[in-house]
Structures are given as structure tokens and as C-alpha cells.
């Protein structure tokens, strides 16, 4: 069983993604996005911003909604005292003495496809796109080089990239 680890709240400023520290901040922080399963969203906010995109299927659903809400002038806040137990990823892979979170090749398809779909949106801030894209390239490059089955990861990542460019949504093709 993996060790319990706190995921930080993050905020992109300029070309930096900063992990926000609850121990040195107030109890509530303005953030880029939150995990959807841990969100409390008033119904009137859903009416104003719209629902979360079901066509994304999985991955970036919450990020897209939070960025859209922020674009429309509604800040997104993380509450430092809130706790959500949530397992992310599959079994970690060890590399150079450290453990790294992994996902299946299928999950990487959605991650890349939905990221590319989000980068195509004109209302997503350019600095956020640049920071996210650079992190995505590093993360997916790592999985292609280190996480077995490497060729399946490469194929699904490439397919996700192409489908994102083509604007395809919904469930992944088999």
C-alpha cells in the first residue's frame, strides 16, 4: 500500500506553477483548480459557468471547469483544513531511488488528448498553457522511457495528441 501523501494546491503565476503552502498561508487559498470529487459547487454557479464537460470522459474535467469559472470572473478556492482521501494512479514506478506516480497507457491517452483540447481553447491563459504543456511533455517523456509497457504508452500518448488536435472527445478508441 502506498503512503498517504498530501497533494498541494497550485497556482500558475507568469511561467511558474507554485505549490501553495497551507502552513504559511491563510485557511483559504485562491488556486488554479481543484479535484472535482472534492468540490462543493453551489447550484447557481453551475448554472452560470455551465456543467463539467462529460465529453472529456476523464482527466482535465475538473481543470477545464475551474479555468472556465476563473475566466468568467469566479475565483476558485482551496480550503486548507478540508481532507479528501483519494487514490491517484496505479502502482508507482521506482526510478533513481524515488517513486513516481503512474497511470495506464489508456489513462495517458485521455490525459494528453484532453490537455491538447484544453490548449486549443482561446479563453485558457497562455501562461497556463505553456506551463502545463512543458510539464506534460516531461511527464509523458518519462513514461515512454521508464514505465512499462513503454511502446503502449508511446502509442496511446501519440494517439491522444492526434485526437486532441483533431478535436475528438468521448471514450477512447480500442
Each model region followed by its residue ranges:
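A short, conserved alpha-helix in the catalytic core of glycosyltransferases
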Residues: 38-39, 44-50, 55-82
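Non-catalytic, C-terminal membrane-associated alpha-helical segments of glycosyltransferases
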Residues: 121-174
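Active-site donor/metal-binding and catalytic loop motifs
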Residues: 79-99
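A structural signal for well-ordered alpha-helical scaffolds and beta->alpha junctions
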Residues: 3, 15-16, 108, 112, ...
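Short glycine-enriched, charge-decorated loop/helix-capping segments at active-site entrances
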Residues: 55, 99-102, 147
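Short glycine/serine- and small hydrophobic-enriched flexible loop segments
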Residues: 68-71, 117-120, 143
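Acidic/His-rich active-site region of diverse nucleotide-sugar glycosyltransferases
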Residues: 1-51
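Extended, non-globular alpha-helical segments
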Residues: 21-42, 94-133, 158
Amino acid at each position: 500500500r502506498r503512503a498517504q501523501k498530501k497533494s498541494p494546491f497550485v497556482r500558475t503565476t507568469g511561467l511558474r506553477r507554485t505549490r501553495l503552502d497551507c502552513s504559511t498561508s491563510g485557511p483559504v487559498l485562491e488556486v488554479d483548480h481543484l479535484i472535482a470529487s472534492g468540490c462543493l459547487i453551489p447550484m447557481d454557479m453551475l448554472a452560470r459557468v455551465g456543467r463539467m464537460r462529460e465529453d472529456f470522459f476523464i482527466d482535465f474535467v475538473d481543470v477545464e471547469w475551474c479555468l472556465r469559472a476563473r475566466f468568467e470572473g469566479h475565483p476558485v478556492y482551496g480550503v486548507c483544513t478540508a481532507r479528501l482521501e483519494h487514490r491517484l494512479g496505479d502502482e508507482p514506478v521506482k526510478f533513481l531511488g524515488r517513486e513516481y506516480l503512474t497511470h495506464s497507457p489508456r489513462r495517458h491517452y485521455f490525459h494528453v488528448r484532453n490537455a491538447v483540447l484544453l490548449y486549443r481553447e482561446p479563453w485558457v491563459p497562455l501562461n497556463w498553457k505553456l506551463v502545463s504543456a512543458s510539464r506534460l511533455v516531461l511527464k509523458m517523456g518519462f513514461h515512454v522511457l521508464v514505465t512499462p509497457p513503454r511502446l503502449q504508452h508511446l502509442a496511446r500518448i501519440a494517439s491522444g495528441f492526434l485526437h486532441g488536435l483533431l478535436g475528438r472527445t468521448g471514450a477512447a478508441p480500442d
